[in-house]
Each structure stands twice: as C-alpha cells, then as structure tokens.
Amino acid sequence: MATRVVTSVEGERFVHKELWRVVLRQGEHAKQAPRGSFYDDLVAMMFCFHALEAYLNYVGEKLAPDLWKDEREYFSRQPYRGFDGKIRKVLELAGLSEPPRNQRPYSSVWTLKKLRDLLAHGKVEVIDT
C-alpha cells in the first residue's frame, strides 16, 4: 500500500503576472506565425487589459487594504465606479495625477478598455453595402 503524502503551500499568487505571460506568449506566437495572427493579437490585447486591471487590484490592495476588502462594492458606485474609478483611485492613493487620456502611452489604456467593452458586451453587427 502506498504512503499518502499531504503537501501544503503558503504564499501569494500574482494573477497580473500570469495574465501578462499570456500577453507575451500570444505576442510571440503572432510573430512566429503572422498568417492568422489577428486572433493572437486580439487575445494579447484582451489579456493586456485584464493584466492591467489585476495589477491595479494588486497595487490598490497594497495601498488601501481595508478599501480593497470590499472592492466590488466600493467600485460599484460613484464617484469611483468601474474601471475608470478604480484607476483614478489608485492614482489618487499613490499621490499621482491622472495623465491626459488622449496622449500615449496612457491613451492605450483607454483604447484597450474600449476593445474589452466591445467584445465583452458584443452585439450582432449588421453590415449593409
């Protein structure tokens, strides 16, 4: 009869890093196989946004652990509603002012947000030519 071994692990798992690895992997795959790379690029862009939001949660929890315990509730209402509110709150907690949203590289965040919203709340697109 085999001996049963039980292992326990303690620590932290950095989800934003795992999500970023997907971005890197999809980007590399797109470079290696340019034909059909649209889908690799699309996955990379979506995961880039998810990695950013996960990183905001990581930083926010470090800066304001009590607030982040009930993060979903806090960011469900004004003045810090949704992703927009979350990024503004993290910047505020870090003592930083928000950069202009129409200037790179910060404008890329909002481009990715639009893409995420478009795909997450996708509707049938009617094309009439």
Labelled PLM ranges:
Residues 1-42:
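Charged alpha-helical initiation segments
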Residues 7-9, 13, 48, 73-76:
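Short linear sequence motifs
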Residues 15, 43-44, 108-111:
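Generic detector of ordered secondary-structure context
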Residues 23-26, 48-55, 112-119:
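Amphipathic alpha-helices that form helix-helix packing interfaces
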Residues 33, 50, 99-103:
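Short, structured coil/loop segments at alpha-helix boundaries
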Residues 38-61:
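Short, hydrophobic, well-ordered secondary-structure elements
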Residues 57-129:
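Flexible secondary-structure boundary motifs
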